[in-house]
Swiss-Prot record:
One of its GO terms (biological process) is carbohydrate utilization. Belongs to the glycosyl hydrolase 68 family. This is Levansucrase. Keywords: Carbohydrate metabolism, Glycosyltransferase, Secreted, Transferase. Its main location: secreted. It is an enzyme of class 2 (transferase). InterPro entries: Glyco_hydro_68 (IPR003469), Glyco_hydro_beta-prop_sf (IPR023296). GO terms for molecular function: levansucrase activity.
Length: 415
């Protein structure tokens, strides 16, 4: 389709050494153990607000809509009971990924979400797992393209089209009956399952670049090559101080933020392009990448875990970001290190899967909050929304809001 000549920006080990856990300007407030839950029937985690190709969060006829990864809470299933017959919520929560389904919720207020049900009926998806992506409102007729990840067998970026229908009382979805596969990892630019059984290839986030009018997509990947074959050169190291040259097993970390371009705005045919960001020797996961376009800059956000950092590096679960004046870079790590918003060390697993919206609001879900010493409370529900301020290559957390507060930025009246 097109020729692109750019080199990925390297997130270096020297950059990651600058991560400062518990910096008050980049740390999410502590969540109270008495948090409310959206539903006693289902867990939710990755949250995908309905948006347009510019990234603006959309309501339809006054209804806010979010999509979530969802799994039933199996409170009465013997498989998730302990030896005394009590419900083991931890076992149920940790099992959720294998039975993930995409569901939707709606609200008049941007909170107090009402459960709408599954987006795709049972049997529509070609794989056993429905993993995260992006719902895009295409027009004022209510057409939606849900870009998502088909997982097990394999991992394929796909989309499915449907329509939103509203009344004064509720929101329903129609269609979503034919899944179209778009592309998978190629083994040349992006690592495949054959190269690494622990490979990552998921989380499509399409957008139209205002500078050239083309449709692109971010996604999570790993740099191609057999697992453990990546070399940590001086370029990946960066300017590390004396005593920090030991990389341990960092050759196993090869995360990247991938890019693809569509043949046209229909989004039916795609060309895989080189990554925008690589994290070889730094981190193995760069999940749910997405853009915020502000002040003529490209703010690229991704989420990652403490446990996926390479040896002799660390950082909290949370949001990491990079900024550039051009789509293809080069990118500068936000706040020198990349860390934009992390969990406090006192509650390292309280939230995850953050999504930064163009209005600065950041949504996430509650994973687990410490309770009574070594015990903890499982969430599976929306976390409090926070707000960050972006100023050049720096960010600051400036406000916090109610649980699951995801207001629309623009309302579309259907014709």
């Amino acid at each position: 389709m097109s020729d692109y000549n750019y080199k990925p920006t390297l997130w270096t080990r020297a950059d990651a050494l600058k991560v400062h856990e518990d910096d008050p300007t980049t740390t999410q407030p502590v969540i109270d153990i008495a948090f409310p839950v959206m539903s006693e029937e289902v867990f939710i985690w990755d949250t995908m607000p309905l948006r347009d190709f510019d990234g603006e969060i959309i309501s339809v006829n006054g209804w806010c809509i979010i999509f979530t990864l969802t799994a039933d809470r199996n409170t009465d299933n013997p498989q998730f009971q302990d030896e005394n017959g009590n419900y083991d919520i931890t076992r149920d929560w940790e099992d959720r990924h294998g039975r993930a389904r995409i569901c939707y919720w709606y609200s008049r207020t941007g909170k107090d979400w009402i459960f709408g049900g599954r987006v795709m009926a049972e049997g529509v998806a070609p794989t056993t797992r429905e993993w995260a992506g992006t719902p895009i409102l295409l027009n004022d007729r209510g057409d939606i393209d849900l870009y998502y990840t088909c997982v097990t067998p394999g991992a394929t970026i796909a989309k499915v089209r449907g329509k939103i229908v509203t009344s004064d009382q509720s929101v329903s979805l129609e269609g979503f009956q034919q899944v179209t596969s778009l592309f998978s990892a190629d083994g040349t630019i992006y690592q495949t399952e054959e190269q690494n059984a622990f490979w990552n290839f998921r989380d499509p986030s399409p957008f139209i670049d205002r500078n050239d009018g083309k449709l692109y997509m971010l996604f999570e990947g790993n740099v191609a090559g057999p697992r453990g074959s990546h070399e940590i050169t001086q370029a990946e190291m960066g300017n590390v101080p004396p005593g920090y040259e030991d990389v341990g097993g960092a050759k196993y970390q090869a995360g990247c933020v991938g890019l693809a371009v569509a043949k046209d705005l229909s989004g039916s045919e795609w060309q895989i392009l080189p990554p925008l960001i690589t994290a070889v020797g730094v981190n193995d996961q760069t999940e749910r990448p997405h853009f915020v376009f502000q002040d003529g800059k490209y703010y690229l956000f991704t989420i990652s875990h403490k446990y996926t950092f390479a040896d002799n590096l660390t950082g909290p679960d949370g949001v990491y970001g990079f900024v550039s004046d051009k789509l293809t870079g080069p990118y500068t790590p936000m706040n020198s290190s990349g860390l934009v918003l992390g969990n406090p060390s006192s509650q390292p697993f309280q939230t995850y899967s953050h999504y930064v919206m163009p209005n600065g609001l950041v949504t996430s879900f509650i994973d687990s909050v410490p309770w009574k010493g070594k015990d903890y409370r499982i969430g599976g529900t929306e976390a409090p929304t926070v707000k960050i301020l972006l100023k050049g290559d720096r960010s600051f957390i400036v406000d916090s809001f109610d649980y699951g507060y995801i207001p629309a930025m623009k309302d579309i009246t259907l014709k």
